[in-house]
């Protein structure tokens, strides 16, 4: 047993969170195609001595959109400013941000789909012409003022590409879609995180944490810290598969990475609505969760793992979901599954 003090103070936890984040594109694990393209665009911008074109990251939460934005600023050697769509309440807030940017700085706006229409209108000329068009005064005394801005790079992130207006979406020269990570990529992240936290972990222990992390690095970091806590209290020098499994089971994360909320979602559709189809508003009411949270956080992983189908009539559970819940699937679901296997054989 190590003589390290398991009582870690808040400062160290904050440092640990920052250290777990990769600092360069070479350190960043996963998203190989996106990283390769970003390297080219960053290098080209540096050679030209110009600001990088505006970048839009699209994907579920926790896949590294903010981290990639920070890395891009570091690789470009410029300042990084960060905010989010809901924080920019009025045009003046955006104007204050933009006028404080220096040449080629990176401005990161998370949840850009939540910008108000008035703020979005101000953003168009800022992105395209690097100018602010502001109305000063009211009534007959009102006048239009143009303010020149430093040539900056806007890096934006969204989980809901469909909520972006076409004029805003078209102004991003570099759209980047991020996908869920493979178990192998997450396993590497787990081992790296364990080294940083000075905690031993076996190969099967790392894989157990990785495969139950919903394909998401942010969840990997959270689960690894909690598994580490269980291991320390148990007096273990190394996290093996048994310790990881016990810790994750106590955290109610099952062997497919589904947590309590995921299982409630599946059970509501299965037990209350016979497996669907059922509308999203009905599910949201049953879970007492907002629709956005369900569509952004719960459903993407369930769909990717084959538990759920979105149809014009509503959400429908697949045979995989019924099997995972340990419930008998309706006859039509079994028939569809058998028909799919038959078509594959053909």
Curated annotation (Swiss-Prot):
Cited function: The RuvA-RuvB-RuvC complex processes Holliday junction (HJ) DNA during genetic recombination and DNA repair, while the RuvA-RuvB complex plays an important role in the rescue of blocked DNA replication forks via replication fork reversal (RFR). RuvA specifically binds to HJ cruciform DNA, conferring on it an open structure. The RuvB hexamer acts as an ATP-dependent pump, pulling dsDNA into and through the RuvAB complex. RuvB forms 2 homohexamers on either side of HJ DNA bound by 1 or 2 RuvA tetramers; 4 subunits per hexamer contact DNA at a time.
Gene Ontology annotations of biological process type: DNA recombination; DNA repair
Domain-level remarks: Has 3 domains, the large (RuvB-L) and small ATPase (RuvB-S) domains and the C-terminal head (RuvB-H) domain. The head domain binds DNA, while the ATPase domains jointly bind ATP, ADP or are empty depending on the state of the subunit in the translocation cycle. During a single DNA translocation step the structure of each domain remains the same, but their relative positions change.
Region (Large ATPase domain (RuvB-L)): 1-181
Region called Small ATPAse domain (RuvB-S), residue ranges: 182-252
Gene Ontology molecular function, alphabetical: ATP binding; ATP hydrolysis activity; four-way junction DNA binding; four-way junction helicase activity
UniProt-listed InterPro entries: AAA+_ATPase, AAA_lid_4, CbxX/CfxQ, DNA_helicase_Holl-junc_RuvB, P-loop_NTPase, RuvB-like_N, RuvB_C, WH-like_DNA-bd_sf
Alphabetized NCBIfam families for the sequence: PRK00080.1, ruvB
UniProt key word RNA-binding: no
Alphabetic keyword roster: ATP-binding, Cytoplasm, DNA damage, DNA recombination, DNA repair, DNA-binding, Hydrolase, Nucleotide-binding
Catalyzed reaction equations: ATP + H2O = ADP + phosphate + H(+)
Similarity field: Belongs to the RuvB family.
Subunit structure: Homohexamer. Forms an RuvA(8)-RuvB(12)-Holliday junction (HJ) complex. HJ DNA is sandwiched between 2 RuvA tetramers; dsDNA enters through RuvA and exits via RuvB. An RuvB hexamer assembles on each DNA strand where it exits the tetramer. Each RuvB hexamer is contacted by two RuvA subunits (via domain III) on 2 adjacent RuvB subunits; this complex drives branch migration. In the full resolvosome a probable DNA-RuvA(4)-RuvB(12)-RuvC(2) complex forms which resolves the HJ.
Disulfide bond sites: none
Domain of life, per lineage: Bacteria
SUPFAM superfamilies: P-loop containing nucleoside triphosphate hydrolases, Winged helix' DNA-binding domain
Annotated positions binding DNA: 291, 310, 315
Any one GO CC term of the record: cytoplasm
Main location: cytoplasm
EC number(s) per entry: 3.6.4.-
Record region (Head domain (RuvB-H)): 255-346
Protein's UniProt name: Holliday junction branch migration complex subunit RuvB
Enzyme class: hydrolase
Alphabetized Pfam families for the sequence: AAA_lid_4 (PF17864), RuvB_C (PF05491), RuvB_N (PF05496)
